[in-house]
């Protein structure tokens, strides 16, 4: 049975730009590794317990996807930072926010998300788990009740 994802592969048209975006903007760590077959040294981006292996679009490592192209990925990353902090980071780096913050449904429940594009125009969703506290729920109920009274 499948229990988790170990890594994914990202095909990049310009490794330097890709590394700068994921490391300098998103805060991932660049790591070099040598495959167990002793092949060419490769690069990966580490974050948490996961990693993204990088393939150069001009010469992807084998084996590789049937049609390895850059710009075809849509991925969601979970973060401990607030949406306001991410908004500031993207603003400082002159990265346009395509959408958000918006509430979405993630693998483990509600999330708040911002959407941006990486240098290859992959869709990058940055999310924070969204917990409804009792105070937040009560506040929403009171606002709805007040609005209903206003309409009556």
Predicted regions and their residues:
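A short, sequence-level motif marking secondary-structure junctions
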Residues: 56-61, 131
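Vicinal oxygen chelate
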Residues: 1, 4-13, 43-46, 64-141, 149-152
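A short, acidic/glycine-rich surface segment
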Residues: 59-64, 100, 104
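Core segments of cupin and vicinal oxygen chelate
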Residues: 11-58
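N-terminal beta-strand motif that seeds the catalytic metal site of vicinal oxygen chelate
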Residues: 1-17, 73-75, 130-135, 152
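Short coil/turn motifs at beta-sheet boundaries
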Residues: 38, 68-70, 107-109
């Amino acid at each position: 049975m499948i229990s988790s994802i170990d890594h994914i592969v990202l095909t990049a048209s310009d490794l330097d730009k890709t590394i700068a975006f994921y490391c300098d903007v998103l805060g991932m760590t660049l790591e070099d590794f040598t495959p167990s077959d002793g092949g060419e040294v490769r690069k990966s981006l580490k974050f948490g317990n996961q990693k993204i292996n990088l393939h150069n679009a001009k010469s992807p490592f084998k084996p590789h996807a049937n049609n390895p192209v850059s710009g075809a990925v849509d991925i969601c990353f979970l973060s401990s930072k607030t949406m306001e902090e991410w908004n500031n980071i993207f603003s400082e780096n002159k990265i346009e926010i395509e959408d958000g913050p918006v509430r979405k449904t993630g693998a483990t429940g509600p999330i708040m998300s911002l959407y941006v594009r990486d240098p290859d125009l992959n869709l990058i969703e940055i999310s924070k788990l969204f917990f409804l506290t009792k105070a937040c729920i009560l506040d929403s109920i009171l606002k709805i009740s007040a609005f209903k009274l206003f309409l009556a």
